C-alpha cells in the first residue's frame, strides 16, 4: 500500500512529526512518526515488513501511531504544535531553535543569532 503525503507538521518539543496521508480511494490517515527523515508534502511512503520506504528508499522512520483523518483532529494538531515552519512554504531563519529538540531543522531553517 502506498500513501502520498499531503501535509506535514513537526513538534519541536517532542522531536516527532505528523504527516497527513492519502491512499487508495482517497482514504486519509494522520501518521505520527519519529526518525531522521522528514516526510514532505509530495513524498510517497510504503510500509513494508522490513520498515518504511519513502520515495522508494528505506528510511529510518518509526510510525508511533496512525490516526483516522478528520479535519478537527488535524486542525487541533496544527493549532497546538508551535513550530514556525509549520504551514509556511519556506523558512530561512528560526528564533526558536533553543527550545527545539531537532538537531537539524526539518524545514532547513538556520538559527537567528543576535
From Swiss-Prot:
Name of the protein this chain belongs to: Anti-adapter protein IraM
This protein's record includes keyword RNA-binding: no
Membership in a protein family: Belongs to the IraM/RssC family.
Location in the cell: Cytoplasm
Gene3D superfamilies: 2.40.50.650
Keyword terms of this UniProt record: Cytoplasm, Stress response
InterPro entries: Anti-adapter_IraM, PmrD_sf
The organism's place on the tree of life at top rank: Bacteria
UniProt key word Cytoplasm: yes
Function: Involved in the stabilization of the sigma stress factor RpoS.
A GO biological process held by the record: cellular response to starvation
Organism (species): Citrobacter koseri (strain ATCC BAA-895 / CDC 4225-83 / SGSC4696)
GO (cellular component) term, any one: cytoplasm
UniProt-listed HAMAP family: Anti_adapt_IraM
Amino acid at each position: 500500500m502506498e500513501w502520498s503525503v499531503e501535509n506535514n507538521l513537526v513538534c519541536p518539543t517532542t522531536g516527532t512529526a505528523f504527516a497527513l496521508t492519502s491512499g487508495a480511494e482517497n482514504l486519509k490517515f494522520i501518521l505520527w512518526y519519529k526518525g531522521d527523515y522528514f516526510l514532505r508534502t509530495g513524498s510517497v511512503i510504503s510500509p513494508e515488513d522490513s520498515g518504511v520506504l519513502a520515495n522508494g528508499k528505506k528510511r529510518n522512520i518509526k510510525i508511533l501511531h496512525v490516526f483516522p483523518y478528520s479535519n478537527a483532529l488535524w486542525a487541533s494538531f496544527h493549532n497546538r504544535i508551535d513550530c514556525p515552519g509549520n504551514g509556511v512554504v519556506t523558512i530561512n531563519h528560526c528564533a526558536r531553535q533553543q527550545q527545539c529538540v531537532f538537531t537539524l531543522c526539518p524545514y532547513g531553517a538556520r538559527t537567528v543569532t543576535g
